[in-house]
């Protein structure tokens, strides 16, 4: 899966938060609370994690053409 490695705005590394964030939100926790507990304070970093859509599942449906 392609995950956000860094914040697109400020450049802060975010990859270490992705798995825990995703699993806790899918488990029913409030994303705001999860981000606060992970220590993600900047709104640009929060936006990057909240808005990420795992598009790899859509992309891999297509065959590679050379």
Curated annotation (Swiss-Prot):
PROSITE patterns: RNA_POL_N_8KD. It catalyses: RNA(n) + a ribonucleoside 5'-triphosphate = RNA(n+1) + diphosphate. Its EC number is 2.7.7.6. It comes from the Archaea. It is found in: Cytoplasm. The keyword Transcription applies. Its main location: cytoplasm. Zn(2+) binds at residues 7, 10, 44-45. Pfam families: RNA_pol_N. Keywords: Cytoplasm, DNA-directed RNA polymerase, Metal-binding, Nucleotidyltransferase, Transcription, Transferase, Zinc. Binds 1 zinc ion. One of its GO terms (biological process) is DNA-templated transcription. GO terms for molecular function: DNA binding; DNA-directed RNA polymerase activity; zinc ion binding. InterPro entries: RNA_pol_su_RPB10, RNA_pol_suN_Zn-BS, RPABC5/Rpb10. It is an enzyme of class 2 (transferase). GO terms for cellular component: cytoplasm; DNA-directed RNA polymerase complex. Its cofactor is Zn(2+). Gene3D superfamilies: Homeodomain-like. Belongs to the archaeal Rpo10/eukaryotic RPB10 RNA polymerase subunit family. DNA-dependent RNA polymerase (RNAP) catalyzes the transcription of DNA into RNA using the four ribonucleoside triphosphates as substrates. Part of the RNA polymerase complex. This is DNA-directed RNA polymerase subunit Rpo10.
């Amino acid at each position: 899966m392609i995950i956000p490695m860094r914040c697109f705005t400020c450049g802060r590394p975010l990859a270490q938060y992705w798995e825990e964030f995703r699993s806790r939100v899918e488990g029913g926790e409030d994303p705001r609370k999860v981000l606060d507990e992970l220590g993600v304070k900047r709104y640009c970093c929060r936006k990057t994690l909240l808005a990420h859509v795992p598009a790899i599942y859509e992309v891999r449906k297509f065959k590679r053409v050379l």
